[in-house]
């Protein structure tokens, strides 16, 4: 199968031939499906491929192999959804980058099955007239099973732009409304590193 809807399965060339899946058009209705198809993992951590910006139709998920929890006696035992740290809010001249507003001129998201890296390339024009190009990369490390890394590059066109980025750790993630963890401690180290410690509610 070479393509299905807005997905293509034959985008790789040369040594990457038949290794690359591409989503060529953004669709809010298909977010959950693409998050599952593009999911990344290393045998210890597994993550759904939710985008950096938040959408109402998404399902964010980070899971740890072998970790199970039951919220109460009447609930089923399940893989608890861990804290999310991939949400990045980006503002250009005070307008937030979201593909459901403004104009998305170009969109491509790819998963290379050979190295496990997800890349996303977006050309976007805000309602305030700002035009910019975005490059996103994310991978789950095999070398260090505790590492998930992401990189964002922003290239405004034509003029100087004030860029504001807001990121953090959301420890209030749920499994369809069931929150398995409660916050124990959250703090910043030298304004460069955020530490978040949580504890399970739980009954195994």
PLM regions: where:
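Beta-sandwich/jelly-roll carbohydrate-recognition scaffolds of carbohydrate-active enzymes
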Residues: 5-204
């Amino acid at each position: 199968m070479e393509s299905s809807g807005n997905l293509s399965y034959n985008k790789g060339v040369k040594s990457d031939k038949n290794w690359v899946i591409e989503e060529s058009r953004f669709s809010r209705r298909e977010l959950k499906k693409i998050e599952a198809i593009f999911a990344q993992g290393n045998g210890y951590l597994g993550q759904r491929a939710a985008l950096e910006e938040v959408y109402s139709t998404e399902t964010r998920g980070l899971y740890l192999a072998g970790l199970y929890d039951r919220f109460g006696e009447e609930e089923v035992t399940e893989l608890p959804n861990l804290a999310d740290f991939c949400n990045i809010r980006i503002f250009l001249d005070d307008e937030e980058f979201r593909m459901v507003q403004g104009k998305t001129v170009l969109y491509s998201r790819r998963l290379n099955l050979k190295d496990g890296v997800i890349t996303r390339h977006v050309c976007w024009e805000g309602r305030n007239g700002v035009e910019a190009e975005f490059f996103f990369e994310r991978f789950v490390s095999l070398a260090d099973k505790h590492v998930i890394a992401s990189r964002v590059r922003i290239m405004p066109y034509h003029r100087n732009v004030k860029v504001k980025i807001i990121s953090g750790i959301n420890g209030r993630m749920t499994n369809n409304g069931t929150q398995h963890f409660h916050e124990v401690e959250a703090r910043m180290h030298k304004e460069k590193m955020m530490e978040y410690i949580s504890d399970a509610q739980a009954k195994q």
